[in-house]
């Protein structure tokens, strides 16, 4: 593949790239680039929003470059302050390592494990002593740190900034020195940290890494970023039917962004789909089904994805209730109030999310809308439907 084609693939769906001329010089050397992306395992599972970065790593992998999936087990215990209005509570080593194992299993649904270098930044950071940290801290000034947007806002609002939070971008930057990275990838909220890596590499006599940022993926609502706490996410490990159904709820406009950022479709294939929809040759719903099946197949295989599509059409196009809905039992009383059984069964992410959905009229029992979140259900068996795509067989004892 010639350089122009490589650049087109590399820049696909990117938000910003620093610096394109430097990248051309690196590519001209004809050796595989060392491409790094770091992930702090602060939660036990990944959702599709995280995979924007992983898909970009895959693009580099397909071009023959060395991909480094860096697990920030050391930085995870500090807590990334990026985009935070308050100090993030640090995790224990045990929590971080447990989450890291889950991450590895999930990312290899996208990346080729044979072509991926998995590293932990504790490999070099655990060897750092007090003198090493003081030397590292001397490489950056407080004034430069306060140029970072989230730090500046907190400083001007007289909100607490802990010293350890200043260390986070320095440690992340030093990771690039330790790995001799040619390129580092990150979300747009990581730009400051990525540039610190360039600065530290220059000071260590290394060729500064290029920086590529990817956009933050909007959640199912199309407004806010995908987040488990907001309930607008699709988890990588969700059952095929749930994943397919959630993806069918995105808007027609957001569908194309998902195609570009979190599928393996080529830009030419996506452009052809857009042309067919615009000409009326292909219905937008069919294009969305193709998207949902493609993404579901990435994580569950083509057979399960096809079954999910077939099941979706049986339930929603024909108004059927699925035969294989999950079953959940609870006791009469507090446990049988709608927010409780929705959250405890996993149908809703939390009791707060359940209450919001009930107020929006999203809950029905045996086909009847239910808008009272406070009254416990009496003993019996119910078919629960939450929104368009979530079903539950509820047994109250």
Curated annotation (Swiss-Prot):
GO terms for cellular component: cytosol. One of its GO terms (molecular function) is ATP binding. Catalyzes the attachment of tyrosine to tRNA(Tyr) in a two-step reaction: tyrosine is first activated by ATP to form Tyr-AMP and then transferred to the acceptor end of tRNA(Tyr). Residues 340-396 form the S4 RNA-binding domain. CDD domains: S4, TyrRS_core. A motif ('KMSKS' region) lies at residues 225-229. A motif ('HIGH' region) lies at residues 41-50. It is found in: Cytoplasm. It catalyses: tRNA(Tyr) + L-tyrosine + ATP = L-tyrosyl-tRNA(Tyr) + AMP + diphosphate + H(+). This is Tyrosine--tRNA ligase. Keywords: Aminoacyl-tRNA synthetase, ATP-binding, Cytoplasm, Ligase, Nucleotide-binding, Protein biosynthesis, RNA-binding. InterPro entries: aa-tRNA-synth_I_CS (IPR001412), aa-tRNA-synth_Ic (IPR002305), Rossmann-like_a/b/a_fold (IPR014729), S4_RNA-bd (IPR002942), S4_RNA-bd_sf (IPR036986), Tyr-tRNA-ligase (IPR002307), Tyr-tRNA-ligase_bac-type (IPR024088), Tyr-tRNA-ligase_bac_2 (IPR024108). Belongs to the class-I aminoacyl-tRNA synthetase family. TyrS type 2 subfamily. Pfam families: S4 (PF01479), tRNA-synt_1b (PF00579). Its EC number is 6.1.1.1. Homodimer. GO terms for biological process: tyrosyl-tRNA aminoacylation. PANTHER family: TYROSINE--TRNA LIGASE, TYROSYL-TRNA SYNTHETASE. The keyword Cytoplasm applies. ATP binds at residue 228.
């Amino acid at each position: 593949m010639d350089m122009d084609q490589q650049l087109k693939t590399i820049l696909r769906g990117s938000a910003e790239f620093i610096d394109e001329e430097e990248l051309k010089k690196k590519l001209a050397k004809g050796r595989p680039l060392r491409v790094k992306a770091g992930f702090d395992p602060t939660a036990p599972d990944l959702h599709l929003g995280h995979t924007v970065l992983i898909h970009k790593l895959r693009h580099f992998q397909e071009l023959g470059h060395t991909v480094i999936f860096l697990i920030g087990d050391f930085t995870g215990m500090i807590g990334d302050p990026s985009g935070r209005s308050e100090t993030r509570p640090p995790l224990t080593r045990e929590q971080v390592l447990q989450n890291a194992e889950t991450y590895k299993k999930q990312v290899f649904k996208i990346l080729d494990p044979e072509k991926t270098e998995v590293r932990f930044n504790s490999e070099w950071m655990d060897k750092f002593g007090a003198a090493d940290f003081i030397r590292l801290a001397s490489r950056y000034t407080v004034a430069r740190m306060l140029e970072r947007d989230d730090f500046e806002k907190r400083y001007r609002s007289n909100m607490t900034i802990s010293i350890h939070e200043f260390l986070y971008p320095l440690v992340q930057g030093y990771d690039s020195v330790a790995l001799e990275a040619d390129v580092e990838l990150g979300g747009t909220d990581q730009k400051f940290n990525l540039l610190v890596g360039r600065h530290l590499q220059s000071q260590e006599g290394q060729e500064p890494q290029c920086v590529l940022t990817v956009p933050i993926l909007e959640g199912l609502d199309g407004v806010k970023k995908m987040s488990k706490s907001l309930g607008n996410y699709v988890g990588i490990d969700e059952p095929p039917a749930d994943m397919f159904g959630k993806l069918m709820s995105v808007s027609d406009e957001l569908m194309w962004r998902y195609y570009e950022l979190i599928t393996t479709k080529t830009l030419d294939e996506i452009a052809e789909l857009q042309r067919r929809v615009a000409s009326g040759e292909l219905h937008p719903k069919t294009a969305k089904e193709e998207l949902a099946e493609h993404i579901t197949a990435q994580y569950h295989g083509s057979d399960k994805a096809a079954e999910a599509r077939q099941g979706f059409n049986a339930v929603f196009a024909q108004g059927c209730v699925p035969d294989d809905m999950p079953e959940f039992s609870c006791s009469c009383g507090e446990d049988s109030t709608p927010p409780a059984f929705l959250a405890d069964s996993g149908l809703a992410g939390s009791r707060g999310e359940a209450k919001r959905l009930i107020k929006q009229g999203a809950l029905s029992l045996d086909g009847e809308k239910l808008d009272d979140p406070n009254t416990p259900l009496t003993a019996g068996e119910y078919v629960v439907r939450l929104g368009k795509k979530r079903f539950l067989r509820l047994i109250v004892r």
